[in-house]
Amino acid sequence: MNTSTLTPAVSRWVIFILAIGAGFSVASIYYAQPLLPLMGTDLHLSIEGMGMVPTLTQAGYALGILFLLPLGDRYDRRTLIVVKSIALAGLLLACSLTGQIHSLLLVSLLIGMAATMAQDIVPAAAILAPEGKQGKTVGTVMTGLLLGILLSRTVSGVVGEAFGWRVMYQLAAGSIAILAAVMWLILPRFAVHSNLRYPDLMRSVVHLWRRYPALRRAALAQGFLSIAFSAFWSTLAVMLMEHYQLGSSVAGGYGIAGAAGALAAPLAGGLADKLGAGKVTQLGAALVTVSFALMFLMPALGVHGQLILIAVSAVGFDLGLQSSLVAHQNLVYGLEPQARGRLNALLFTGVFIGMALGSALGSQLYTMAGWPGVIALATVTAAIALAIRLAESARTSASVMQNS
């Protein structure tokens, strides 16, 4: 296949494969979270050392989004996706072979950068979507991506406990290598929307950031939600082991509860069309805030009640976060369609800076204040995101009243 014009039947299959590719690639940056106790035992890491693995992976993802994702507006997306796939497969294999902390941290950073192929896939799906179905198509691919984020913990937790953390990374490397071949075979070549040199392309990213206040607020709000999300998932496995003597497979099992939220991605897109993207971001941020705040009730419950409450909260905050993310994407993509790659880069730079901060702050607060400290961080940052969206709504309403 070498054209960018697809029949509807073929397009559906290609979009399905893209959803799988997005899920598997983004999963690469989350496999470590339920495996941290196993890695720590194997490599003799402190809690702070374990926390640096997801922190650097998320930081690498943020760097890759900011500095590599804009290339999608300059070069053929198929080539970018395949090259990143090959690099990611090699890095995952290298991670499985590492024997000391410094090489593990370096490879974790590079895995994050290569895994940004997931964010090349999302705009590619929008381009390949049939006329009038871009929202639904992006929602489908985002469902794959979000399921990859959440189910990655379940898979890695089970595989890690049964076979060891190194085997999990070897299986991940094999799956990405297969995807690289499939993507090369099925994807068309994509039109290039810019002939800017790389330095000019990056300057245009700065221009877009300055030009659109709505973009800045979207990145900031989603970034604060991401701090909450990452702080929870980065410390959950350690907390379950220390307080309940539960292994990594149980920590991964909570990903199944969170996966229910990922299924809301297409629904959130439709809701944004009816209520407006801004309204959906408010509802999503409110749900995240309430879901984390509920976990302050844990001391009043027995052990089983506490574990159930964690699962219920995970469903709630994942549902809210993913709904807010899809609505923010709809909002940002509409600002300047010819610059989707760069706009996506800016939005997700905010997201994954938040993820990296959440991992780092979560680990530090868990060491200093335990699980209540992590929940306090998550609740406060989610509330800040809600305040940003409510302030945006108030600003818009005031502007409408002045103009009427």
Features from the language model and the residues they span:
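Cytoplasmic helix-loop-helix junction between adjacent transmembrane helices
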Residues: 107-145
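Helix-loop-helix hairpin linking two adjacent transmembrane segments in secondary transporters
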Residues: 103, 140-187
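Intracellular juxtamembrane helix-capping segments at the cytosolic ends
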Residues: 117-129, 321-336
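C-terminal transmembrane helical hairpin of 12-TM major facilitator-type secondary transporters
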Residues: 279-327
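Juxtamembrane intracellular "pre-TM" segments in multi-pass secondary transporters
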Residues: 2-8, 187-220
